[in-house]
Amino acid sequence: MPCLHEIKALLALRGKPFHPDEKFKEKSPFWCLDGLSEEDVCSVMARSVCAKSAFELWGHGQTHSELRTSLLNYPSEDMSPFMHKDSTYRINVLTFNKTLLFAERIKRIDDLDYLPFEGTVSLKSPQHIFCMLEDYGTDPNNIPEHPNYIYFGRWIADGQRELIRSHSVKHRHFIGNTSMDAGLSFIMANHAKVKENDLVFDPFVGTGSLLVACSHFGAYVCGTDIDYNTIHGKGRSSRKNQKWRGPDENIRANLRQYGKEKMYLDVMVSDASKSLWRKAALFDAIITDPPYGIRESTRRTGSHKDTTKPPDGVYVESHVPVSQAYHLSDIFTDLLNFSAHHLVMGGRLVYWLPVYRPDYCEEMVPLNPCLQLISNCEQTLSSHTSRRLITMEKIKEPEELDSLAHLADPHFSPYQGHNAFRAKYFSGLNKRRGKEDNKSDFNGV
């Protein structure tokens, strides 16, 4: 679940542990966390796109009677700064999985008359907002008459879900067929713990969606891609009713669109299988979405010839490299080895791993001795395919044999199966289309 790991990563940025209460359930829409200051909460909510709102919990219970008892036991000295006569306030009633009538919400508010509110009600611009939260479960086909649980507290901050709308690829200047969704881009940046003045690199940069998200959090960004046309903003457009890309469609223009051009270092045409960087720990985070061979091809430069260095003084015909297939298992092996060498200690690698769901097991996740697996979250793409958001952290410097460790690892054989992902993807697609055709033929008869 990306939300859990996003919150953990953002708390880690402040050096805070994730301490849920004893009733914590990951799939619940309401989480109660202990040991956080209001400053900690505001810092997390200033970046999170998964969390909707955060509150200081004053009372809770399975019934309104239990809620009343809990609220009356809350220390009055903690309430009074927000309830004195010179303050203004508003009370909201929020529900999950059920809509209450206006009269029902008003009744809920009136029933809180046992609380010592002395201030003035202000619906438009209150100094303090209080909320009653009612949880009606997660099954829309089985909504209970009464809430499963009720919470009451003081609103502290909202999350940054507005970023998903403001940075939507629908309104972005430069896009491609596989431009990463804005929400997922920000989640990846948070998983990587990207912060101000970090240096972030994307080796499969494409149209730069991940660079846009990282630059929003104050990081300097750069990237490479093997596709010359994408890097230089040339060729056919991915937009409807537009044949060719415009002269100013490029990654730099995307950052300029959001006022982050100063965070742009550069992007280059480069083959990810052949590193062009000096041997040093350069990057605070590496965030990428490698091509899967479905909508974007997996390519690297190579040769069909067996080339050897000619003797001195012997002239040979010049050779132009050609494009070759780049197997998914090789992509991930190279990506992890590159990250082990070029991430700073404690830096994070965040990337997407496509999988064929019927064959998936945790052993298929590529490993590297220098990188510790932090999280593994699934995004379902279809009934038979999904992709896993993998987060890894550098825990040691690479040694000479680390780059070959995957060959001796028993996990290596299972994740070579990623090479067949494209064939399995289209096999499942063709089977589904065949069933639909048979069904339409049957209905036609």
Labelled PLM ranges:
Residues M1-C42, S53, F96-N97, L123-C131, ...:
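Class I S-adenosyl-L-methionine-dependent methyltransferase catalytic core
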Residues P2, Y74-P140:
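A short N-terminal interaction module
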Residues L10, S70-Y74, L112, N254:
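Residues that form generic nucleotide/phosphate-binding pockets
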Residues D21-M83:
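Conserved AdoMet
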